[in-house]
Amino acid sequence: MPPLRLPTGTQVVARIPVKDQSGVDRATGSVGVVVAVDDLPDSTYLVQDPDGGEPRYSRSDLIVRAEAQWAPPATVQNLWDRVILSSVIGSRAYGLATDASDTDRRGAYLAPAPLDWSLRGAPEQLQDDVRQACFWEVKKLLTLALKANPNALECLYSPLVEHTTPPGEELLAIRSSFLSKVVYATYNGYALSQFKKMDADRRMRGEVNWKHAMHLLRALMAGIVALREGHLPLDVGAHREQLLAIRRGEIAWSDVESWRLSLHREFDRAVADTRLPDRPDYQAAETFLISARLRAASELLGDNGA
């Protein structure tokens, strides 16, 4: 997978030596800030160095400084190529997208063995704010999914999978292992606390974050289905128009609150009747992680001719 586009303001490290606009040499490892990006398919980046020099680089010649601090350039440059799963989540996966909606991507990458074994370890995530993309290192994604983190579970259950590799397919194959009664604590508990906060803001300032209210109701419905049916639905289906009306502020707060309370009661019944286990399948996650690490190690041995 190619490196994602960098926004202006990103601190970067140069992978190659170049000359700036004045003909001054800029060494490998030079640190600067992206000040401009052209819109051509093969984007070039204008980077301002601390002394004011402004060399140009291609995307492949730059490393995000936060990532470079974790590992040497020769290793970091390949991390974007190690994405094993990329899924669209958010409004587009929920069936709630409007013309103004972003396309949010989440997924995982598999760190190369030398980076995973190093003292610094691999970065927990690769992030691109321009494209609204975040790829967790495999272990981090597994940890989040075992805790029933909504973003992690949604990237595993999204109907909009843009990219997978064999390890990514193996990860999707065990996604049901992460569903358990923990979903109730995470989804129901978060919605309850957030609605209390929104109600307090409404009383004090007369303001309601209608978009947030819409997504909390959607999450409650998804969690209920997960407990009842053993899978996590993302698309809201027949509830689309009602949820979008809430987002537009066209539904009275009292009606939103009534729906929310009804969903909490439904969630309580669902967790009492669910066939899901009390805890997720840690062994399945462990087995997958070990397999993924062995795969990364075998790549290293193969590269070394072993």
List where the protein language model places each region.
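Short, Gly/Pro- and small/polar-rich lid/capping loops
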Residues: W70-L79, L85
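Basic/aromatic-rich interaction segments and small domains that mediate binding to polyanionic partners
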Residues: M1-D61
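Short, amphipathic C-terminal "tail helix"
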Residues: Q283-A306
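Conserved nucleotidyltransferase catalytic core and NTase-mimicking acidic/glycine-rich helix/loop elements
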Residues: H163-F288
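Short beta-strand or tight-loop elements
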Residues: S30, I84, S101
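Short gly/ser-rich loop at a beta-strand->alpha-helix junction or flexible surface loop bordering the NTP-binding
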Residues: V83-Y94
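A basic- and aromatic-enriched beta-loop-alpha substructure that forms the phosphate/nucleotide-
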Residues: D116-F195
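Catalytic metal-binding acidic patch
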Residues: Y94-D128, L216
